């Protein structure tokens, strides 16, 4: 899958779950499960409930995503 196929949307982290998984409420009020992208894990970027994040979704599974950026 190429990077052109992903859907990027912003949201707020609601809850931290085990194994670097988070519940994120998107701007359109949907709640999805997200995991942290590898580069964020590599650079030890911490994500806490209440943080504003950018999420990538694939067209195949719109209920799971990947957190790619944490806004400051």
From Swiss-Prot:
Domain S1-like: 1-72
Primary location recorded for the protein, binned into one broad class: cytoplasm
Key words, A-Z: Cytoplasm, Initiation factor, Protein biosynthesis, RNA-binding, rRNA-binding
InterPro entries: NA-bd_OB-fold, RNA-binding_domain_S1_IF1, TIF_IF1
Regions crossing the membrane: none
Superkingdom, natural source: Bacteria
GO molecular function annotations of the record: ribosome binding; rRNA binding; translation initiation factor activity
Cystine crosslinks: none
An example Gene Ontology CC term for this record: cytosol
Subcellular location: Cytoplasm
Protein family according to the UniProt entry: Belongs to the IF-1 family.
Quaternary structure, from the entry: Component of the 30S ribosomal translation pre-initiation complex which assembles on the 30S ribosome in the order IF-2 and IF-3, IF-1 and N-formylmethionyl-tRNA(fMet); mRNA recruitment can occur at any time during PIC assembly.
Record's function text: One of the essential components for the initiation of protein synthesis. Stabilizes the binding of IF-2 and IF-3 on the 30S subunit to which N-formylmethionyl-tRNA(fMet) subsequently binds. Helps modulate mRNA selection, yielding the 30S pre-initiation complex (PIC). Upon addition of the 50S ribosomal subunit IF-1, IF-2 and IF-3 are released leaving the mature 70S translation initiation complex.
Protein name, per record: Translation initiation factor IF-1
């Amino acid at each position: 899958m190429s990077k052109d196929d992903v859907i990027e949307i912003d949201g707020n982290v609601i809850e931290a779950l085990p194994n670097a998984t988070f519940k994120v409420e998107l701007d359109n009020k949907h709640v999805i499960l997200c995991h942290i992208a590898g580069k964020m894990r590599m650079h030890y970027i911490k994500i806490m409930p209440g943080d504003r994040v950018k999420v990538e979704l694939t067209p195949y599974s719109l209920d799971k995503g990947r957190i790619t950026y944490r806004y400051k």
